[in-house]
């Protein structure tokens, strides 16, 4: 049994709360395609997906086929979409498990069409046409959509189940970001209209990510793709205070050692922290190998007995040190909240940690190394 005190708590009650918030944000009749890629943003795909399926989520989105297979093997029966498409040789398994895939090349289309013909499962390959409206990553360029759709008709074993795109800057609420999101929405709407003009009838039309769910009115869409908002974090600082979501993840540990150090004493690698006065230092068994960013050196904060304590010195692979001089009553064995809500009421949000680490909340959540850190599910 792993007795190491560094654990991640996943609050399923908070997940349910956030799901309800998203349901209220989208228009009536708009379904939810929950994004559970990257092990549900570090929260554990199996428990999260099972909980969302109980809540009535319409479908799940993953990054690649292996993640979709994991969902199916864990008993998930709702539709699954591979956002990043599949690779050569994966066609048969994708079709056999009734998993839908993004499509953005005729070579992909030909391979899927042939696989559907050969496996004789009397099931067409379900595809979602990915349109590049300005992200510049994956997708058929928006101006090439008419020609692509015309050529796609030659493949009789494909079903255009959906059409989608992805916003590049929906989380940027400055005039430039807003204008580009509007331009992408217009390009996407034109692509949808072109598909219908050519006789396609996609079941699902979707473009709204978490940021767009909070800001955009997209009446031509009937599916939304909430990701980070489900996990209680915000797409960017521009959304602070706009939605009462609840953090689902709490990373916690315990004080392993306390010691007083004299003025001039250096702490950790590189001697980046030197005590200016007599200080009480707590050693806590968590480090960058667990996903606690090394860039939080001398910047990060933790909560002990409801009080904040700053990281003192370089974050190590397995340890951090905290200056707890002003934490009243601190003792060996005390709980330490490193990320997420503390039982005493304060919270180290993913946004706060990301800002101090010079990154984004997505990386903070996905970076928690659950191969080393146990997950405990609550609620």
Swiss-Prot record:
<feature type="binding site">
    <location>
        <position position="317"/>
    </location>
    <ligand>
        <name>substrate</name>
    </ligand>
</feature>
<dbReference type="GO" id="GO:0030632">
    <property type="term" value="P:D-alanine biosynthetic process"/>
</dbReference>
<dbReference type="GO" id="GO:0008784">
    <property type="term" value="F:alanine racemase activity"/>
</dbReference>
<dbReference type="InterPro" id="IPR001608">
    <property type="entry name" value="Ala_racemase_N"/>
</dbReference>
<feature type="active site" description="Proton acceptor; specific for D-alanine">
    <location>
        <position position="37"/>
    </location>
</feature>
<dbReference type="InterPro" id="IPR011079">
    <property type="entry name" value="Ala_racemase_C"/>
</dbReference>
<dbReference type="Pfam" id="PF00842">
    <property type="entry name" value="Ala_racemase_C"/>
</dbReference>
<keyword id="KW-0663">Pyridoxal phosphate</keyword>
<feature type="active site" description="Proton acceptor; specific for L-alanine">
    <location>
        <position position="269"/>
    </location>
</feature>
<keyword id="KW-0413">Isomerase</keyword>
<comment type="pathway">
    <text>Amino-acid biosynthesis; D-alanine biosynthesis; D-alanine from L-alanine: step 1/1.</text>
</comment>
<dbReference type="InterPro" id="IPR020622">
    <property type="entry name" value="Ala_racemase_pyridoxalP-BS"/>
</dbReference>
<dbReference type="Pfam" id="PF01168">
    <property type="entry name" value="Ala_racemase_N"/>
</dbReference>
<feature type="modified residue" description="N6-(pyridoxal phosphate)lysine">
    <location>
        <position position="37"/>
    </location>
</feature>
<dbReference type="InterPro" id="IPR009006">
    <property type="entry name" value="Ala_racemase/Decarboxylase_C"/>
</dbReference>
<dbReference type="InterPro" id="IPR029066">
    <property type="entry name" value="PLP-binding_barrel"/>
</dbReference>
<protein>
    <recommendedName>
        <fullName>Alanine racemase</fullName>
        <ecNumber>5.1.1.1</ecNumber>
    </recommendedName>
</protein>
<dbReference type="GO" id="GO:0005829">
    <property type="term" value="C:cytosol"/>
</dbReference>
<comment type="similarity">
    <text>Belongs to the alanine racemase family.</text>
</comment>
<dbReference type="GO" id="GO:0030170">
    <property type="term" value="F:pyridoxal phosphate binding"/>
</dbReference>
<comment type="function">
    <text>Catalyzes the interconversion of L-alanine and D-alanine. May also act on other amino acids.</text>
</comment>
<feature type="binding site">
    <location>
        <position position="137"/>
    </location>
    <ligand>
        <name>substrate</name>
    </ligand>
</feature>
<dbReference type="InterPro" id="IPR000821">
    <property type="entry name" value="Ala_racemase"/>
</dbReference>
